[in-house]
Amino acid sequence: SHSYAGGPSVYRTAIDDPSLEAAGLRLLEALDWHGPAMVEFKYDPVDGEFYLMEINPRFWGSLALPVTAGVDFPKLYYELATGGVDEPAFDYETGVGCHLLIGELSYLYSILTDDYAFIEKPALLPELVAIGRSVVTEPQFDYLALDDPRPFLCKLGALACELPSLTRDLLAGPLTS
C-alpha cells in the first residue's frame, strides 16, 4: 500500500554513493551471489547512517529508475547470460528521478481516507502541488511511456475495477489505525 504512513517508494532519484555500492558488493560477495539482487539500505537522519534493510535475490520493483538513468539491468543480464558482453558498463546519470504514478495517486488518496494515531497527516494541497510539480519537472514513470502505453493502461484498468470500493471508502470517511 502506498500510504502517507509508509510503504513502497513512489518517487526515487538516482544517486552515486560509492560507500553504499561497496557495502552492497561486500554482502553479495560474502554470499557468493551471482545474478540480479537488490540490496536495500535505509538512511537514518538522526545519526546520518545507512542501515541494511534487506537483500532480495531478484530484480527490484523500482527497476525503471536505473533503466531511465542509463543502466538497463535486464538487458545487461541477458547479454551476460548469452555471451553478448564480457564486462558490463554501469555508467548512469545521477539526479534522474522516476515516479510510480499509481503509487503517487494512492498516496494522495490515503491522505483523504486514512488516519493514523501516531503519524501526522500531511495537508493535501501542498502534497498535490509538490507531486504535480515533480511530475512536470521529472516526467519519467515506471509504467507510463508514450512509445509503450499498454503497461500503464493495464494498471489504470485494474484501478478502474477498484473504483467502486475506493469511492465507498472515500465516502465512509477516514480509516483509523
Protein language model regions, located:
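ATP-dependent carboxylate/phosphate-activation module, predominantly the ATP-grasp catalytic core
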Residues: 1-32, 56-81
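A short glycine-rich, hydrophobically flanked beta-strand micro-motif that places a catalytic Asp/Glu
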Residues: 34-45
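Secondary-structure boundary/capping residues
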Residues: 36, 64, 86-87
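Protein kinase-like catalytic core scaffold
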Residues: 37, 49-54
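Short acidic alpha-helical/loop segments enriched in Asp/Glu that coordinate divalent cations
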Residues: 40, 65-66, 91
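Active-site acidic catalytic loop and adjacent metal/ATP-binding pocket
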Residues: 42, 51, 77
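Short acidic-glycine loop/turn motifs at beta-strand connectors
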Residues: 45-47, 82-83
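Peripheral (often C-terminal) accessory segments that flank ATP-dependent C-N-forming ligase machineries
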Residues: 79-177
